[in-house]
Amino acid sequence: MNTKEIVNKYEFKFNKNLGQNFLIDESVLEDIIEGAEINKEDTVIEIGPGVGTLTKELLERAKEVYSIELDGDLIPILQEELKEYNNFTLIHKDALKIDFNELMENKDSIKLVANLPYYVTTPIISRLLTEKCNFKSLTIMIQKEVAERINAEPNCKEYGSLTVLVQYYCNTKIIRKVSPNSFIPRPKVDSIVIKLDRLSEPRVRVKSQKLFFNVVRSSFNMRRKTLWNSLKSLNINKESMENAFERAGIDSKRRGETLSIEEFGKLSDCIYDIL
């Protein structure tokens, strides 16, 4: 059965508070599966399985699938629809409260697949990256605006702290755009399927990751201000900051959106040296 048929079979009522939009376009489903490159060596963690349409395809291809679902009304539906699969584990919990490192312990090839509710997209991605969770890739359907921020380059309005965070840890690839007509109920915004492939090492080597991300966040907190004004929030004396900018070879009158990840790394290391 397809998604619409399962929804009708169980007379499921969508929960607006959970941002539920179920995928009904089979071509998008196929592109997610192909893009995620799932094989029998992989453990898949799926966030937001809905009624299990994508989950079935994952179960056919993966070694095992762990699906995380918050909505208690979906639990019996998933249990019934996927009862024939012995490689399926259903977790009834808020994904924001999951200990992903514990879940991934002693598993070698882990890939995440998710149709993320828009309100949890950035917190989930940030947690998975900063907590150094052991995953190979993350294939997600997210709001078009967020995907464009993740995939942005310096000197454009989409480029920001989320861009730097994701590209510090991952290569990014947009798989396809998805129209609102591909879902029930129909969302008000376009979506994009994007894949994040985890790098074996962060894109730049820095002396302090904590300082690096503090510099990045401070640089984008007030986008229209210069680096000099933005980085005053670090509470470093004027002479030391002048020294750091000079050593990094970066003009303090530039704005954060003009710096590459490598330049952010160089600047944070020079600040680290003068602390």
Curated annotation (Swiss-Prot):
Entry protein name: Ribosomal RNA small subunit methyltransferase A
Pfam families assigned: RrnaAD
UniProt cross-references to HAMAP family, sorted A to Z: 16SrRNA_methyltr_A
Main subcellular location: cytoplasm
Record's keyword annotation contains Transferase: yes
An annotated GO cellular component: cytosol
Keywords: Cytoplasm, Methyltransferase, RNA-binding, rRNA processing, S-adenosyl-L-methionine, Transferase
Gene: rsmA
